[in-house]
């Protein structure tokens, strides 16, 4: 069969041989072009997937090998848990609206009376003057500087509100006893070491509220 084909090729006119050779080269070129085209399309698709993954933020566990995905998932869960954690002491200090609501009736009445005097009577004027002088005399901090530069009426209102917050922090629960009073101070002590202005205000609130505490 091969010898017959070879004999036919030898006997074939030269112009036909040229035509067949050109056709063969054309087929090879077309085949090579298709291969290059397929390779180019595959490369574009890979680049597109990579770009989409980058725009999404990061590679998801589903696109990673199984062992790497198992390592990433606990880290993600740990990060989510840490985001939900909040410092309990600071929350307790800053949450004003719920403090003092569960005090005993007698203590609650005394607490509200004291707060009313701070906002409406001479006790409040004496309080803000004392706080202003103590803050002025202390070592300068960004918070103390901010308060000292306030307009007088605004500063007085801010100091009264901060004092009220501390009063409601210290006097709360079914019945606040002296040991509870001391314990609440210890709870917020780390916070006060960083916030010297708050420490001064808390000390004045402590002094004002001491008569409410039952032995």
Swiss-Prot record:
Residues 15-22 are annotated as: Involved in self-degradation and in host STAT1 degradation. Y1 and Y2 proteins are produced not only by alternative initiation, but also by proteolytic cleavage of C'. Only alternative initiation is detected in vitro, whereas in vivo cleavage seems to be predominant. InterPro entries: Paramyxo_C (IPR002608). Pfam families: Paramyxo_C. GO terms for biological process: symbiont-mediated suppression of host innate immune response; symbiont-mediated suppression of host JAK-STAT cascade via inhibition of STAT1 activity; symbiont-mediated suppression of host JAK-STAT cascade via inhibition of STAT2 activity; symbiont-mediated suppression of host type I interferon-mediated signaling pathway. Signal peptide: none annotated. Keywords: Host cytoplasm, Host-virus interaction, Inhibition of host innate immune response by virus, Inhibition of host interferon signaling pathway by virus, Inhibition of host STAT1 by virus, Inhibition of host STAT2 by virus, Interferon antiviral system evasion, Viral immunoevasion, Virion. Residues 12-34 are annotated as: Disordered. One of its GO terms (cellular component) is virion component. Belongs to the respirovirus protein C family. The different isoforms interact (via C-terminus) with unphosphorylated and phosphorylated human STAT1 (via N-terminus), favoring the formation of parallel STAT1 homodimers. The different isoforms do not interact with host STAT2. C protein interacts with L protein; this interaction has an inhibitory effect on viral transcription and replication. The different isoforms prevent the establishment of cellular antiviral state by blocking the interferon-alpha/beta (IFN-alpha/beta) and IFN-gamma signaling pathways. They inhibit IFN-alpha/beta induced tyrosine phosphorylation of STAT1 and STAT2. Blocking the IFN-alpha/beta pathway requires binding to STAT1 in the cytoplasm. They inhibit IFN-gamma induced serine phosphorylation of STAT1. Block the IFN-gamma pathway by binding to and stabilizing the parallel form of the STAT1 dimer, further inducing high-molecular-weight complex (HMWC) formation and inhibition of transcription by IFN-gamma. The disordered region at the N-terminus is involved in C protein self-degradation in trans. This self-degradation of C protein may play a role in the regulation of viral RNA synthesis. The disordered region at the N-terminus is also involved in the host STAT1 degradation in order to counteract the host innate antiviral response. The P/V/C gene has two overlapping open reading frames. One encodes the P/V/W proteins and the other the C/Y proteins. This is C' protein. It comes from Sendai virus (strain Z) (SeV).
